[in-house]
Amino acid sequence: YRYSTGLSFIYPDYHPAATSGDSLRLLFEFNTSDLLFVNNDSAATGSYAISFALYKDMESKLIVDSGVRYFTCSKPLEEGFRLRGAIDVVAPDSFNYFMRLDFSDLNRNQAVTDIIIIDRTGIQSPDKFLLVDAYTNAPLIRNFSDRPTNVRIVQNSDTKRPVFMRYFKTDYPIADP
C-alpha cells in the first residue's frame, strides 16, 4: 500500500528477506531519476532517507523495531538507473508483522509512505526465499521484470532445507509461474 500527501515522484520497491531467526533484511530499489539531484562543488548528489517502524500486527501500538537511515548518492551517468540497498531489521521469527516505511527525498522535501506485511510464520514463509538473477546474482525486488530473465530461487536463512515447488503448465494462454 502506498500513500503520499501530494503529487508523488518517488516509486520505491521493497522486499523483506529473512536472514536468520531474529533478523530481517529489507531490500529496496528505486529509479534514480525519481530523485532530485543538486549540484555541489564537484558533482550532482541526491540525498534520501528511509524511516521504518515495525509493528507486531496491524492494530498494535507496540513497535518491535524502528529507525532512520540516511543515504547520499551521486548522479549516475545513465538515465533510468535503479539503485539498490538494504536495511537490517530486528524481527523475531513466528509472527506476522506490519511495517510502515517512509521514503523521503531530502532535496525535494517530499516523502511517500508504504506499508508492507511481513510473514515470518512457518518453514515455507515467502520471506525466507529470494528470487535472484541467474547471471548477476542480483535480487529481483519487483514482482515483474521488464526483460526476459533467467532466475534462481535461493533460501535466505541459515538452515538449508529442501525447497518443494509446484509448477503448472497448461495450454491456457497465461504466463508460466
Q: What are these language model-derived features?
A:
Residues Y1-P177:
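Intrinsically disordered, low-complexity terminal regions enriched in Ser/Thr/Pro/Gly
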